[in-house]
UniProtKB/Swiss-Prot annotation:
InterPro entries: Aldolase_class_II_sugar_metab, Aldolase_II/adducin_N, Aldolase_II/adducin_N_sf, MethylthioRu-1-P_deHdtase_MtnB. It holds the Pfam family Aldolase_II. Its EC number is 4.2.1.109. Pathway: Amino-acid biosynthesis; L-methionine biosynthesis via salvage pathway; L-methionine from S-methyl-5-thio-alpha-D-ribose 1-phosphate: step 2/6. Zn(2+) binds at residues 101, 103. It is an enzyme of class 4 (lyase). This is Methylthioribulose-1-phosphate dehydratase. One of its GO terms (cellular component) is cytosol. GO terms for biological process: L-methionine salvage from methylthioadenosine; pentose catabolic process. Keywords: Amino-acid biosynthesis, Lyase, Metal-binding, Methionine biosynthesis, Zinc.
């Protein structure tokens, strides 16, 4: 019976990741093989998309198990190079149950053009999708970090600011990282953030 419960738990995790990948692909947030998705199971195991898979066509076999340090449990599997950014979040907050990373047009362009170290989002009703926000009459900052192929080094830059992040964070010329207590919450936060970034991009284009 215990093994059946374990298998069911893993199957649910795979299903959530596959469905979220399809949703992100439909929205154009994970072009080609970009992006990665993960979730933490009730027993503490971490499921994440394997490296190189198209997120719009994921199957259960495209989801692999990793240790809390980001090492594939099965040595034959290859995890994304950015796996460390997922495990960093899980280690930072035990309440985090899912992490999503996408590469949308709006996130990419805005992150490359913003001169400061954060994008400020203010006055939007959709800000209320984020925990603790009860009004549109507020502003939240989305931290920006320079892209770095050395993921361990990038993680050390991100780490000091994690506790203050309300929206997620954005890597310049790359994409966003968002998370939530479960996959539904993480996906809602991602959709809310991508909507806000699309609005900001449209406003800039209107001014041009």
């Amino acid at each position: 019976m215990q093994n059946l419960k374990v298998d069911e738990s893993w199957g649910n995790a795979c299903r959530q990741i596959v469905q979220a990948g399809q949703r992100m692909d439909q929205r154009g947030w994970v072009p080609a093989t970009a992006g990665n998705l993960s979730c933490r199971l009730p027993d503490g195991r971490i499921a994440i998309t394997r490296s190189g898979g198209h997120k719009g066509f994921l199957t259960d076999s495209d989801v692999i198990e990793i240790t809390p340090d980001g090492v594939p449990v099965d040595p034959a599997n290859r995890a994304s190079a950015e796996t460390l950014l997922h495990t960093q979040l899980y280690a930072h907050d035990p309440a985090i149950g899912a992490v999503l990373h996408g590469h949308s047009v709006a996130a990419t362009i805005l992150s490359m053009d913003e001169p400061s170290d954060a994008i400020t989002l203010a006055g939007y009703e959709v800000l209320k999708v984020f925990e603790g926000q009860t009004t549109h009459d507020t502003s939240l900052e989305l931290p920006l970090f320079h892209n770095d192929q050395d993921i361990a080094r990038l993680a050390t830059v991100v780490a000091p600011k994690l506790s203050d992040m309300r929206l997620g964070y954005l890597i310049r010329g790359h994409g966003v990282y968002v998370w939530g207590k479960d996959m539904f919450t993480a996906l809602a936060r991602l959709e809310g953030l991508e909507f806000l970034l699309a609005c900001e991009l449209a406003r800039l284009q209107k001014k041009a």
